Curated annotation (Swiss-Prot):
It comes from the Eukaryota. It comes from Rattus norvegicus (Rat). One of its GO terms (cellular component) is mitochondrial small ribosomal subunit. This is Large ribosomal subunit protein mL42. Belongs to the mitochondrion-specific ribosomal protein mL42 family. Component of the mitochondrial ribosome large subunit (39S) which comprises a 16S rRNA and about 50 distinct proteins. Component of the mitochondrial ribosome small subunit (28S) which comprises a 12S rRNA and about 30 distinct proteins. It is found in: Mitochondrion. The lineage of its organism: Eukaryota, Metazoa, Chordata, Craniata, Vertebrata. Residues 1-31 form a transit peptide.
Length: 141
């Protein structure tokens, strides 16, 4: 109970500091406050305002433009003289090392890991399913 009273009193003093009330009315229809807990060099300037009816607090914080001199260009890697391995080079070396798997095809476990599927999807259908498949299905109307 006392904590709630202290909380209400502290918030009431903050409201009075931000938006002074004189004779039951707000001194300014749209009183602004530039109070900010952010550091001065932060890329945002916060402004608080109270609407004319006194029920809504409006917070406006536009981002500050950064001068061009303070920016850096995005480094683009040189693809011709790049010594780092690219994704394609890594895949090529893995596939070149596994000539056995290329001749008979990748194994079912590898296929399920590459395509994020279950292992059952890569097994062939049996004779029971193949003989019941309609070879000449009827055409749609």
């Amino acid at each position: 109970m006392t904590a709630a009273v202290k909380w209400a009193v502290s918030h009431r003093t903050i409201w009075r500091h931000l938006f002074p009330i004189q004779n039951g009315a707000i001194s300014s229809a749209c009183h602004k406050s530039t109070y900010s807990s952010l550091p001065d060099d932060y890329n945002c300037k916060v402004e608080l305002a109270l609407t004319s009816d006194g029920r809504t607090i409006v917070c406006y914080h536009p981002s500050v433009d950064v001068p061009y001199e303070h920016t850096k260009p995005i480094p683009h890697p040189d693809l011709l003289h790049n010594n780092e391995e690219t994704h394609e080079q890594i895949l090529r070396t893995k596939l070149e090392g596994n000539h056995k798997h290329l001749e008979q095809g990748p194994m079912i476990e590898q296929l399920s890991k590459v395509f994020f599927t279950t292992k059952h999807r890569w097994y062939p259908h049996g004779q029971y399913h193949r003989c019941r498949k309609k070879l000449n299905p009827p055409k749609d109307r």
